[in-house]
Amino acid sequence: AANIQVLEGMEAVRKRPAMYIGDTGERGYHHLVYEVVDNSIDEALAGYCTQIDVIINPDGSLTVADNGRGIPVDMHPTQHRPAIEVVLTVLHAGGKFDGSNYKVSGGLHGVGVSCVNALSDWMKVEVKRGGKIHHIEFSRGHVTQPLTIVGECGSETGTRVTFFPDHTIFSCHAFKWEILCNRLRELAFLNKGVTIHFRDDEGEAHHEETFHYEGGLDQFVEFLNQNKKPLSPIIHFEGQKPGLTGLVQAEVSMQYTDSYSTLEQTYCNNIHTVEGGTHLSGFRRALTATINKYGADNNLIKAKDQLTGEDMREGLTVIVSVKVPQPQFEGQTKTKLGNGEVDGIVSSIVSDKLMTFFEENPAVAKTIIEKTLLAARAREAARAARDSTRRKGVMDGLSLPGKLRDCSERDPAKTELYLVEGDSAGGSAQSGRDRATQAILPLRGKVLNVEKARVDRMLANAEIRTLITAIGCGFGEEWDISKARYHKIVIMTDADVDGAHIRTLLLTFFYRKMPELIEKGYVYLAQPPLYKVERKKRTEYVLTDGELTSKLLTLGLDDFEVKGKDGTVLDAAKAKELMTLLAEIEATAKMVEERGFDPAVLVHDENAQGSGASMLKKQFSSLSAYGWGPDDWFAGALPKLLDDVRAHGKQGLSIYRFKGLGEMDADELYDTTMNPAKRHMLRVQSSDAAAADRMFSLLMGDEVEPRRKFIEENALNVRNLDF
């Protein structure tokens, strides 16, 4: 307990949560989990923890358990209360602050679990330490049940934290499997030998995954590059040098592939430094200097070859992980490392080790330099093509594409650019738009897949050149986000397979070539309606099949009596729940049948694998609450009940399904999809660069086999699959 230092109170956390966890949306909600897991990882870094369990509980709470030493439970020397209470209720109270417990540690500026406690509706903590099991409970940062001993644990040690985020603070109200999965996998790669077991007991499909990697960063690079063709083996080196506050350790794994993009992932004390920092600048400097020196010394690079650092990083996947005793982070949410001495230390380690690798592997060095020279030549060829896309000045309308129908407003913060599929929809959008703030750019045919094209070929493509010119930020070396002519760039395509393909091609372009537009939140997806529903003189527009089903069930249950299996009449809420469940069973059974399986056989097969089988079993398990089982469904009585309710709901309705944007007239398109007062739009965000990179490589890259495998594994998760 004497190692726990108290620096300040935590009253401010609930008043200004964004200052401590970044935001109160999805990112901040999941950040709570990272804070608790970081404590367990700190125990692993210190050599005391080998197993971490993360569980999303059925009630929406989350548990993190480890087999570390357990949070201290003895009395704090100055606070005169148990140390665990201090750690969990006082901001900046933790063993990491006096340097004797942990050599290095992560956690958000040390606010850690106390911050999570303050922002949780409730938190329960169980500690195994000193042969006893200790239990304490909190609500919104205050103790509700004091520390008590609830059992014996022998020689076992560890901490188990369960918390439920305060929904009055957060706009996000559920943990997402994918988001947590990516971060936990990342932590297992960064801390080789640690086992992280992740389970979701809340969702329909009970996901479960175990992450354990003895290969560490090398396996991380292999994982990131699994959908790319390698041009070099994985190059790994590590070293340590004294810094201002102790020993700085650096570890680097890198590999070149045939990709035209670069993926750089940097970490300090396991914290993902999204904006890079001194460790990244040190690596880049060393890479550039080493390639230049080796190339010149071995006559592979001539004096006339004007190579840039960007040329040398084309196709590179690299992970730089440093351990720094007292890290300085720029920004409250740790996105950029600021310790000046780390640049020189990383640069020195990389220069020495990379030069040695090149000298011992001349064939690999030659391959890397040849790729660099190709990238430089493509960049030079692109320079000429780029001239045609260069802006003559922000918002002056000079040299804009002929088919762009621009708006009159000159303030980019107020303007929107709609990228519309096809000329017919472009015509409707052009006629119906608000000419003051909305610009229309019709796109003819498919946009080039930039995942498979070098920059010179990309800039030779007319649609891409038009896009670059219209957006106004320039490209490559001339890129300047401040010159964006619109702060909303809206992709508006049909709700069919072709529309989805065009949308994906455009997202690939923005993610690979203009990622800052996504980072700034400038890229959106329009959500045009799928159906027009008319009743008497009233017209409504419906976005999705699910929304239409819900509407029909609501209307159908009006004056319609639904009984349970025992003959009891269900109240309105229970009837709606039952009908919604039956509609879900119908949709899942239909998808299973479309994939060539018999749902009646699958649901009774204990060994049946796959998402379809598990979804059906979960749905039928829910159905048992009403007294029915799978046999009642497959006998036909329940599908008939569902059809009867829907038919009742359809009485007096006219339902029209739009096949494309071009089927709407100008006023209709504006009212449903473009009118700021009524429209639905999705903002495109990327919270995990590695996951996004992997997905774009998988879906849009050259390797066919991984894509086929992905489609086979995920076919059941989509309604509209085009073979």
Which residues make up each language-model segment?
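Conserved phosphate-chemistry cores used by DNA topoisomerases
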Residues: A1-F723
